[in-house]
């Protein structure tokens, strides 16, 4: 969906984080059987942007936070927000979806990778799907032995003004 959105600027131009999130939630709602997809949903001690739950047992399957790129410090705070406020011990699959406005996408991807490896909860890289989607192993702040899979997904919304 994200790559498709990059090719269709009308899906993201003029939208804020919540508007773009709603496009993703709408698509996720129809993609999986036995799964609910919601936006701005309370989990642990805050409202996460995207939450996928198993219909049968109401367990969390996936949690995602959406952010526009505003530099490395803002990005690292977004990771901390996700881990400190939204994850319980049972949550193991999470994502940070980063929307990059304007140009210099390659430079931003380099800064994202650098920032991830500097983060206090970072353990190691797990799998690189491509240049814009990388899976990492992080640890929970309250249980350093508990590993969490964090997918960083970057989207090049180059038609948006920075």
Where are these regions (language model features)?
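Conserved catalytic cores of phosphodiester-cleaving nucleases, focusing on short active-site segments
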Residues: 24, 50-52, 61-68, 85-86
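Acidic-basic catalytic patches of nuclease active cores, encompassing PD-(D/E)XK
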Residues: 1-38
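Short, flexible loop/turn elements at secondary-structure junctions
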Residues: 54-56, 67-70, 154-159
